[in-house]
Structures are given as C-alpha cells and as structure tokens.
A protein has these predicted regions:
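Short pre-catalytic strand/loop immediately N-terminal to key active-site residues, enriched for Gly-Thr
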Residues: 113, 163-168, 220-225
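NAD(P)-dependent Rossmann-like dehydrogenase/reductase catalytic/cofactor-binding core
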Residues: 203-265
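Small-residue helix-packing motif on alpha-helices
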Residues: 29, 39, 57, 194-201, ...
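Rossmann-like NAD(P)(H) cofactor-binding subdomain of soluble oxidoreductases
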Residues: 37, 46, 54-59, 63-130
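Internal alpha-helical scaffold of NAD(P)-dependent oxidoreductase catalytic cores
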Residues: 101, 105-111, 127-166, 178-215, ...
C-alpha cells in the first residue's frame, strides 16, 4: 500500500510530489488524474505509478491529498466517500473549502487536514498554512503531517479562520512577486541591461531581501530604512512607490483574493 495518494496532479500537486520524492520511495506514492497524457508524462519523469480511479487511490493510500479545484470537490468526495475510513487522513489543498464541508460530504467522523501550499514547493522553498484538529491524530501521525509539509519548505499551523488569509499572502503571493520581478527587470532593460541579467539581478534582490526579513528578525520597515540614505537615490524611489500607492494596491489585491475565497465556499 502507498503511504500517500494524490487525487489530481496539477502544478501544486506535482511540485509537492517532486519534493516528496527526496524523502520517499516511488512505491510510497501514487496518484490519479483525468489527463491521460499528463499521467504518462509524470510516470515517465518520476517513476511514480498512477492508479486508474479515485476509488483505487483512496483504497491504496493512508494519506489522501485532494489536489483538485474547488468546483470538482463535490463529485470527487462523492466518488471516494465509501472508500475512506477513520484510518485515512485526508489532506485538502483547495482554497475556500472548509474542514467541516469536506467531513460532511465524506459522511462525517473523518480526519481532515486543511492546507494551502504554494508553487515554490517545486524547489523545496514552499510555504504552507496548515490546520487540523490535533485531538484526532496520534503523535506519530502529527509528526508525519509535519514531515510531509516540511519536505517541500516551511509550514505554519494556523487556526482555520486564517486560511483565506494564507491564500492571499502566501499561496497566491508568488504571482504578485513575479510581477514585481518582471517590472524591475523591464526597468533594467529600459536602461540598456540585457534581459537575462536584469531577471537575475531583480530575482536575487527579492531572494536576499526575503532572507533578511526571515533571518534578522527586523521589521521590514526598519530594513527598508536601512537602505534609504538621507537625500539618496533609494528614498526618492520609495517616495514614488508611496505616491502611486504600492501598499494600497497590494492590500486591495489581497482583498479581492480573500473575497474570491469566500465565494468558493
């Protein structure tokens, strides 16, 4: 029996599975996906063998990862309802889908972990918000859950009411950050820099800045102030970002993301 089964193999699920293969054997993992061409490609790339149906996946893995879009949840949960037991641990990674809603559709009395990872999981640098009822899990299972998510980056245990916020500021954040990197690089190209050099410089600036926040423990505002010399070039750039509403644009974007999470319920 496989330890981990993925129902659905989109970008996030694939990123997670690739990272898990650094710790688990190929025979410990299985998956299903409707796209047969993608199934064949993933089997060839990873050595992980797919099973034919969602029911097969549920019956052949203890940890079942629901890696499907929210609009497909009802059909998939109905599909596997009679094939999961109290021994299974269901890991749901769809935005807006609550633990109670998954549990209810599986007949109740099931053990659900709700999580929201992001795509940097593909290179082992993911961030995942996780919530579950700890009373329902053995210590060895809790450790397995931690090992699962930490195999592709960092994790934070959060209360479930924060999960929509996790989507906004972490799961969706790579898209915002890629836009920022692209904008910086476009500016570099405007000034005559080769595009590949501009991308590397902009991306490393983001990586290094993020590490400064994580490793120094200093407030981001204080780190910003450290770069801004009185009357210098950086404070002039910062003043323009403030004038054009960078902070407000980011918060408004997160507001839109949050509202969409609510709609997905």
């Amino acid at each position: 029996m496989a330890k981990i089964g993925f129902i659905g193999m989109g970008n996030i699920a694939y990123a997670i599975m690739r990272s898990l293969l650094n710790k688990y054997k190929t025979e410990d993992i299985t998956f299903t996906d409707l796209n047969r061409r993608r199934v064949a490609q993933i089997e060839k790339e990873t050595g992980v063998k797919a099973v034919d149906t969602n029911q097969d996946c549920a019956e052949n893995a203890k940890y079942i990862v629901l890696a499907i879009k929210p609009q497909f949840y009802d059909n998939v949960l109905a599909d596997i309802k009679d094939h999961v037991t109290k021994e299974n641990i269901i890991i749901s990674i769809a935005p807006g889908i609550t633990i109670d809603s998954v549990n209810e559709k599986l007949g109740g009395d099931r053990r659900i972990v709700r999580a929201m990872p992001n795509t940097p999981a593909l290179i082992g640098e993911g961030m995942t918000g996780v919530c579950y009822d700890k009373k329902l899990f053995e210590e060895t299972e809790k450790q397995m859950i931690s090992n699962f998510f930490e195999s592709f980056g960092m994790m934070e245990i959060v209360p479930e009411y924060m999960m929509n916020a996790v989507v906004c500021i972490s799961s969706s954040a790579p898209a915002y950050i890629y836009m920022f990197i692209e904008a910086l690089a476009d500016a570099g190209v405007k000034y005559g820099m080769p595009r590949d050099v501009a991308y590397r410089m902009a991306a490393q600036g983001v990586v290094g800045s993020a590490k400064m926040v994580l490793e120094t423990g200093k407030h981001p505002g204080a780190l910003k102030d450290d770069v801004c010399s009185p009357g210098g070039t950086t404070i002039y750039a910062v003043s323009v970002l403030e004038e054009y509403g960078l902070r407000n644009a980011v918060i408004k974007a997160c507001d839109a993301c949050y509202e969409k999470c609510i709609d997905l319920k």
